[in-house]
Amino acid sequence: MSRYRGPRLRIVRRLGDLPGLTRKAARRSYPPGQHGQARRKRSEYAIRLEEKQKLRFNYGLSERQLVRYVKKARRMQGSTGTNLLQLLEMRLDNLVFRLGFAPTIPGARQLVNHGHVTVNGRVVDIASYNCRPGEVIGVRQREASRKLVTANLEYPGLANVPVHLDFDKNKLEAKVTGACEREWVALQINELLVVEYYSRKV
């Protein structure tokens, strides 16, 4: 299953607020489609599937990518759900978004892919790059890049920069000081349901 490129508000109406996907809010609170307002009791599978879809659409992942992250989270020590969220939060495109360099994760991915972002002073154009504590995320030293990011910082997607990012707004760079704490994950998600969804699949 490839990365979603369709109407974003349609997804927000179905799954709820997804800060990484779009900062627009749906006008209608019920899902799209002819039977969107019908009230049916959802199965446990449907509830788990919905949580999984929230994670996938918020971080802009393909199904294959998400499965890979779930497998990696299982091999790590500690809670699989917490590990999964930390892995996704430490992706370069997500950190660029959390710093306010771009209004959404798709916007951040474009910044990275177009060579506007550096890690430890070197251009990194891989959005899925896994950032580690001690690394410094910055903006390329050229006028076009800095102008673009400065404009985006006027209207950041989220109000607060997480505590694991030591951000210097004047230099347009941030040092990663550690892994993301659970309370700083912006997405409203029950990660245990995501782990349960994949428990029999991978």
Curated annotation (Swiss-Prot):
- Coiled-coil stretches are none
Signal sequence span is: none
Highest taxon of the lineage: Bacteria
Q: Name one GO molecular function term.
A: structural constituent of ribosome
What Gene3D superfamilies has UniProt attached to this entry?
Ribosomal Protein S4 Delta 41, Chain A, domain 1, RNA-binding S4 domain
Is RNA-binding among this UniProt entry's keywords?
yes
The scientific name of the source species is Synechococcus elongatus (strain ATCC 33912 / PCC 7942 / FACHB-805) (Anacystis nidulans R2)
Return the protein name: Small ribosomal subunit protein uS4
